[in-house]
């Protein structure tokens, strides 16, 4: 079996490549399959599938849902999603509206301190794009407020920063069950990024399995061999499908 990438983002969320550019890059890299998993949306899937139609690559429709966990969120990737599924579309619109409300308030807070961030700039000419904190980071760099993305997140976009506005998440159960209802395969994304102890991770997976979780990312761009070995054993323990991806965002 050839190389696949089951976790990528496009300009329909916080990536810098359009869906068609993503397909072209995947083909040029010799990938056998690629999944588009934009945050909380499937709006880029039609362009993605069309771009791959005559290419020697399998294009997998997907998404990455942010679901509530403690005082933050965790991410559930959904692969092989029916992007036309009515229930999924409704839930996606609810999530996007919540994001928009949060983003508008964050932009207003920046403007009050004479940092002229607007929603028009954040969407960058693509009104269907799901705006994330990465979009804010780009503009903070553009306006010379910070030098790089890490500085933007540490000083201005972290939950402890005065510009940060929390948003309301859907529940873990709702996210997983909606992916399943749309014919998708729900997978816990980048489990080590949540900084949980082994006991906490196992407790979370026990709960998510009850809701229908089917897989976990055992390969990820920042994982060491030791990390991968650890998560692969966790996957076996919980009888979860091993998945993996780069979490490619283009130049972000």
What is the predicted role of each segment?
Residues 51-206:
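Extended substrate/RNA-proximal surfaces in nucleic-acid metabolism proteins
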Residues 1-72, 155-159, 170-252:
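An N-terminally biased module of ancient metal coordination in phosphate/nucleic-acid-related enzymes
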């Amino acid at each position: 079996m050839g190389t696949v990438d089951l976790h990528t983002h496009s300009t329909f969320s916080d990536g810098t490549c359009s869906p068609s550019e993503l397909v072209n890059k995947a083909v040029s890299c010799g990938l056998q399959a690629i999944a588009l998993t934009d945050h909380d949306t499937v709006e880029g899937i039609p362009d993605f599938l069309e771009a791959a139609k005559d290419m020697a690559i399998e294009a997998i429709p997907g998404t990455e849902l942010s679901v509530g966990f403690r005082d933050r969120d965790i991410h559930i990737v959904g692969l092989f999603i029916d992007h036309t599924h009515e229930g999924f579309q409704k839930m996606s619109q609810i999530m996007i509206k919540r994001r928009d409300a949060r983003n508008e308030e964050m932009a207003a807070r920046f403007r009050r301190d004479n940092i002229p961030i607007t929603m028009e700039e954040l969407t960058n000419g693509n009104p269907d794009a799901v705006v994330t904190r990465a979009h804010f980071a780009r503009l903070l760099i553009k306006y010379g407020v910070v030098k790089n993305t890490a500085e933007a997140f540490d000083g201005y976009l972290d939950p402890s920063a005065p510009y940060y506005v929390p948003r309301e998440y859907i529940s873990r159960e709702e996210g997983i069950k909606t992916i399943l209802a749309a014919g998708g395969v729900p997978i816990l994304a980048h489990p080590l990024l949540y900084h949980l102890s082994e006991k906490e991770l196992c407790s979370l997976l026990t709960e998510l399995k009850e809701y229908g979780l089917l897989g976990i990312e055992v390969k990820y761009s920042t994982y060491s061999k030791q990390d991968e070995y650890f998560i692969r054993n966790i996957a076996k323990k919980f009888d979860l499908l091993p998945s993996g991806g780069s979490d490619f965002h283009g130049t972000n």
